[in-house]
């Protein structure tokens, strides 16, 4: 402290004590680096409460794609200015850059989009960092598919007309979106709908940001030829998805969306007609024979 010399030795000297100003600093740093994103320098009297909150700056950083790791100011047990003018108080707030995850785009029809696999690093730029778990991957909600199943059946039944010549056909249109995750554990922060890698809709959102991974339409599917059967004329078109003459299932007329229902379509077949050869009287009758199929025409 300061030494006071009395003006009149032997008499009481009045000494007025004044609290000095103290300084404190709150730094926002990126985890695992020396990068300081922001610094607030504060000043106040010794012993006075530090009038400050990290909420505003953390909200700004979140909007810029950062997630809180530790808040050394809010969790501090003593948030008053100290009494040591020689040493400034330092509080550290640590944040981490969020990671956008976009599924792969299928290269072949009916191939599924792919997310990372369990054991892969959550942040590809930090291969030695935290790894994906199956539990975290299952919660990403960034891949959906609309399926179309075509079954070729005998008219009036649910029996397949020929599992070998006319096997059941299933195809799909897949949709993906970019999920933004916390690099520490892969938990969902939100979804990126603008393409900048930053979450702009909440983690609870189920409808935003979806895009078709390839074509958004089901392609035309010609009905197969089945020996002894022809497609039934005047088919149920099932919402104009099946050609009335049964020759094909139509191409989608409009783009599908992630909310489009799955399609379960039936193409019906009937037996071909028969003919009975006429033989001279007294000859052994010949059993009726089915008309032969046109190998290029299911009808």
Predicted regions located by residue number:
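Terminal, regulation- and interaction-focused segments at domain boundaries
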Residues: 39-42, 51, 202, 207-209
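Surface-exposed interfaces of beta-sheet-rich extracellular modules
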Residues: 1-3, 52-86, 208-253
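Solvent-exposed, conformationally flexible loop/turn segments
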Residues: 7-10, 44-53, 84-88, 114, ...
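Acidic carboxylate motifs that coordinate Ca2+ or other divalent cations, activating on Asp/Glu
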Residues: 196
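Local beta-strand/beta-hairpin segments that build beta-sheet-rich folds
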Residues: 35-43, 159-169
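Conserved "repeat-terminator" motif of extracellular CCP/Sushi domains
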Residues: 3-29, 79-147, 152, 243-281
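Calcium-binding motifs, dominated by EF-hand helix-loop-helix domains
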Residues: 189-191
């Amino acid at each position: 402290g300061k030494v006071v010399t009395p003006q009149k030795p032997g008499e009481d000297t009045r000494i007025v004590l004044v609290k000095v100003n103290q300084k404190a600093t709150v730094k926002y740093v990126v985890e695992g680096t020396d990068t300081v994103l922001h610094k607030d320098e504060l000043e106040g009297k010794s012993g006075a409460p530090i009038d400050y909150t990290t909420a505003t700056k953390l909200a700004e950083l979140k909007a810029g794609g950062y997630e809180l790791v530790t808040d050394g100011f809010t969790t501090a047990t003593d948030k008053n200015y100290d009494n040591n003018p020689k040493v400034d108080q330092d509080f550290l707030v640590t944040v981490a850059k969020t990671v956008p995850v976009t599924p792969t785009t299928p290269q072949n029809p009916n191939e599924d989009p792919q997310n990372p696999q369990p054991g892969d690093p959550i942040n590809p730029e930090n291969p030695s960092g935290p790894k994906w778990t199956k539990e975290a991957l299952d919660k990403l909600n960034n891949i959906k598919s609309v399926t179309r199943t075509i079954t070729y059946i005998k008219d009036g039944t649910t029996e397949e007309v020929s599992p070998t010549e006319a096997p059941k056909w299933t195809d799909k249109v897949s949709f993906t979106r970019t999920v933004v995750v916390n690099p520490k554990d892969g938990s969902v922060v939100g979804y990126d709908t603008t393409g900048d890698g930053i979450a702009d809709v909440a983690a609870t959102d189920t409808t935003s940001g979806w895009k078709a991974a390839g074509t958004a339409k089901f392609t035309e599917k010609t009905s197969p030829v089945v020996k002894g059967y022809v497609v039934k004329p005047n088919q149920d078109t099932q919402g104009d998805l099946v050609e009335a003459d049964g020759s094909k299932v139509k191409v989608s007329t409009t783009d599908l969306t992630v909310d489009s229902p799955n399609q379960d379509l039936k193409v019906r077949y009937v037996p071909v007609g028969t003919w009975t050869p006429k033989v001279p009287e007294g000859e052994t009758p010949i059993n009726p024979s089915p008309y032969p199929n046109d190998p290029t025409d299911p009808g």
